[in-house]
Swiss-Prot record:
A GO BP annotation: regulation of defense response to virus
InterPro entries: Cyclotide, Cyclotide_bracelet_CS, Cyclotide_sf
Disulphide linkage map: 4-20, 8-22, 13-27
Organism: Chassalia parviflora
Protein name in the entry: Circulin-E
Length: 30
């Protein structure tokens, strides 16, 4: 998993357009 450099504590992952998903309050992609 690669961190997308974004947290998702209060808001969803804005980087989800790059297939990033919230996991442990941090956005990751495979």
């Amino acid at each position: 998993k690669i961190p997308c450099g974004e947290s998702c504590v209060w808001i969803p992952c804005l980087t989800s357009v790059f297939n990033c998903k919230c996991e442990n309050k941090v956005c990751y992609h495979d």
